[in-house]
C-alpha cells in the first residue's frame, strides 16, 4: 500500500480524530540536540523579556475573546504560554467548522485538540490497549473536538491579536 492509501485508511477508520494528527504508533519527538542547544542558548538572554511579551499577548487575547462563546477563565498566574488556547464553551460542530474555515481563510496556523492533537486515548496506538477508556473523560473529549491553540510569538503585533479576536468573536 502507498503512504497515501495508508493515511486515507486511518482517516476513514478514525473519523473522530483530526486527520492532521493521527498517531498510529507510540513514538517520541526527536530533535537535533546540538542545533537545538545552540539556538536555545542564544535565546536565553531574551528569555525574561520574551516571557513578559507572551504574558502580555495572552492577556490581550483572553481579554478580547468573547466569554459567551469561548472559555476565557483560565488560571494564568505564573504561567507563560507559548500558545493562545481557546475552547468553545458549548459543543457546537457547526461553529467549530466555521472557526477552522475562518482560520484557514486568513492563513492562521492552528492545531485542534491542543498539544498532541487531542485526546491521546482516542489515538490508534492507545485505543488498541485501552479500548473505549476515552469515554470516561468528557472534558478531555470536549477539548479534543472543540479546542485549539495558535502560536503566541514574541514578535506578534497586538493589532494582529485584536484582529484575530474580532474574527473569532464574529462567528
Feature names for model-found ranges:
Residues 1-83, 117-118:
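Active-site region of PLP-dependent enzymes
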Residues 81-92, 121-133, 145-159:
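Conserved PLP-binding active-site segment of the aspartate aminotransferase-like
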Residues 9-18, 60, 98-138, 142-148:
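Conserved PLP cofactor-binding pocket of PLP-dependent enzymes
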Residues 64, 106, 171:
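Short alpha-helical functional segments enriched in proximate histidine and acidic residues
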Residues 159-171:
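C-terminal/domain-terminus segments
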Residues 58-59, 72, 81-108:
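FAD-dependent oxidoreductase catalytic-site/capping-region signature
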Amino acid at each position: 500500500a502507498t503512504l497515501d492509501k495508508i493515511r486515507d485508511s486511518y482517516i476513514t477508520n478514525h473519523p473522530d480524530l483530526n486527520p492532521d494528527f493521527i498517531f498510529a504508533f507510540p513514538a517520541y519527538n526527536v530533535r537535533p540536540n546540538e542545533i537545538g542547544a545552540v539556538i536555545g542558548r542564544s535565546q536565553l538572554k531574551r528569555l525574561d523579556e520574551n516571557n513578559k511579551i507572551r504574558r502580555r499577548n495572552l492577556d490581550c487575547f483572553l481579554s478580547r475573546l468573547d466569554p459567551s462563546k469561548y472559555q476565557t477563565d483560565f488560571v494564568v498566574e505564573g504561567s507563560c504560554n507559548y500558545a493562545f488556547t481557546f475552547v468553545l464553551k458549548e459543543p457546537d460542530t457547526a461553529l467549530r467548522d466555521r472557526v477552522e474555515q475562518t482560520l484557514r481563510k486568513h492563513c492562521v496556523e492552528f492545531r485542534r485538540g491542543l498539544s498532541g492533537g487531542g485526546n491521546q486515548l482516542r489515538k490508534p496506538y492507545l485505543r488498541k490497549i485501552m479500548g473505549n477508556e476515552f469515554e470516561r473523560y468528557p472534558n478531555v473529549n470536549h477539548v479534543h473536538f472543540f479546542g485549539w491553540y495558535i502560536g503566541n510569538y514574541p514578535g506578534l503585533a497586538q493589532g494582529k491579536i485584536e484582529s484575530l479576536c474580532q474574527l473569532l468573536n464574529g462567528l
